[in-house]
Amino acid sequence: MITIVDYGLGNIKAFANLYKKLNIELVFASDVNDLANATKIILPGVGAFDHAMQMLNDSGMRETLDELVLEKKVPVIGICVGMQMMADSSEEGQLKGLGWIPGTVKKFKRESQALESQYPLPHMGWNSLEIARTSELLLGLDEQKLFYFLHSYYYEPNDKEHVVATANYGFEYACIVNKDNVYGIQCHPEKSHHNGVALLKSFASL
């Protein structure tokens, strides 16, 4: 059962509609009891890192999620801020992250006014992926590999082996990461048309 963590943040209805079109069942989890039958987990997220972490901590689901992901090895995918929450920490806030894939969330820095003008923040719009290594998550993507982005911070994993794909916005940064059963994507698959559907369908098939 694909379960999306409903802790008050993220466009969960968009994922429900997308999976409904694929005839794949998806359920919402707003407490630990709803996680009991999870065989795959989606962790969405929008907004500020600390707010998202506090909302998840307050939901009462964090310990159960740690158990499912780290001990029972249930596949999980974090999306946008949901991916950033998988890091150890973020320059945006003070709270600790989940630490599922060691790394730090950093803010895009602009060393000159020209760069700031060319690459304004937030990074908003379409960008293509550069594949760093093969992954089942990437099956079915088209040749251009365009995805929709909206963010001002990026995830820098400690181990480059965890980088699946990168994007370029003034410099190359990780936009898809993976360690064992843990996946994270910075872009918004629910807004990325064919490629977003293909990626979420591939996650359902893991």
Swiss-Prot record:
Keywords: Amino-acid biosynthesis, Cytoplasm, Glutamine amidotransferase, Histidine biosynthesis, Hydrolase, Lyase. Heterodimer of HisH and HisF. Its EC number is 4.3.2.10, 3.5.1.2. GO terms for molecular function: glutaminase activity; imidazoleglycerol-phosphate synthase activity; lyase activity. One of its GO terms (cellular component) is cytoplasm. Pfam families: GATase (PF00117). This is Imidazole glycerol phosphate synthase subunit HisH 3. GO terms for biological process: L-histidine biosynthetic process. Residues 1-206 form the Glutamine amidotransferase type-1 domain. InterPro entries: Class_I_gatase-like (IPR029062), GATASE (IPR017926), Imidazole-glycPsynth_HisH (IPR010139). It comes from Vibrio vulnificus (strain YJ016). It is found in: Cytoplasm. Its main location: cytoplasm.
